[in-house]
Amino acid sequence: MRKASGGGAISRRQMLRSATATGVALPLAQTFPAGHAYAQGQGQLPEINVTLPVFTVAERDRRWAAVRAIMARPQWNLDAIITVGSDRWGNNARYLTQVALVRYAQPGPQVLFPRDPAKTVHVQISATRHVNSWNDRLGPGGWLADGKMALQAETGGEALAKLLAEEGFDRRGTRIGVAKLKGTRFEPEGLVSATLLDTLRSSLPGVAFVPIEQWGPDAGPIDEVALAKSPEEQEVIRRSVAINEQGLAAAIAAARNGATRQADLWWAAFTTMFADAGEDFIRLSIGLDEGGNSNIGEPVGDAVRRGQICTQEISAAFQGYGCQINHSFFIGSPSTPGYDYYRAAIDVLLKVHEKAMAFIEPGKTTYGEFEENTRQSFADLNEQGGGLGVHSGGIGQCRVRSRPGEDQKIVMQPGHSFDFKPSVSLRRAGMAGAGKRVQLGESILVTEEGAVRYGSRSMGPIATHT
């Protein structure tokens, strides 16, 4: 971690310590040393929004039916799918059940999802207090109301093996799909505990435990379904992107109002996003004159100065869903040296975005073709482009993120949601700021007719001062 200008590293825990001790209504100024430039004139933190599960029983039934249809395909032929406690992110469990637990506090939910719709979907969560909480949230009128899903205060390999046997999944030849066993996006070796898997195999001899994720168009029973967002999911992502834009606006306002450190920008965005979403974000990383991913999602003590270009990776989570935005902004006014270069770079990126959106033909364009079109757009403009052409959007860290190979063969379909985040470093010898990388990223929804933005902000150049 980088060192702050005062000599010490700034951690997210330190940033939150004062607020945790005093309460969410703590004045923002009190989190900074007395006399700190950004501590002057700050008001109260925003009131936090308390959210409850929003997806309808109809949405549950849609997901379950679609996942079960893929489980029945000959190449998968799965009798059930399980998620395990060692997957503490719990994205697949949340997709199937809406149940989530605070990360790192306890094991993730263990789900037994049978292919047979007559069988109950079981969710093992680690304590009675968690069962009571989720019964309250998902009970009357919710996903638990009709008895098709049930919660148990258990966790671990032995509890899961016992449940599988009780539900009739102990017969020789049974095929159980294990979520996150391998082939996952950020964890290619999986998230399943070897000890837990050994317990299942020794307790249930003759039962096959197999992966359910793979790269390419036949992505697996959960990944393939999750790629295409339903209207309900689209509304949740739209809300998440709106929160992203509020976080971006808060960081810009902090720079305008005298922030002196990157940490001040980060904190302004964090408090705004967390308060509106009511849950932790997926990604908040801010760089000054470098990539938005340069600070690995933490506040640091890098100095804020006029003439810098601030780039971010911002992805709130609402109901667990997120879609990233990126919008480099200029710290200073249009008369500050470096602004002309920044504006020229944004103009190039706007042209690339326009060409990219027009290129998408639902049901025809592949993600590989889309990325090649972006490379060609930069070449046509005689500029050095970069950045990810396709980045995931959806629940947690789900796909699609295009990578060399099979995933580029996936065809864009209505409901697919992803981040398009090109960047550019202009060849402008002699211009102030020349060579700095500028990024403009937006969350995209593929529709029946083409593609639209999830966001509503202006995509043009932004200067913090006039």
Sequence positions of predicted segments:
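Active-site neighborhoods and metal-handling regions in enzymes and metal-associated proteins
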Residues: R2-T466
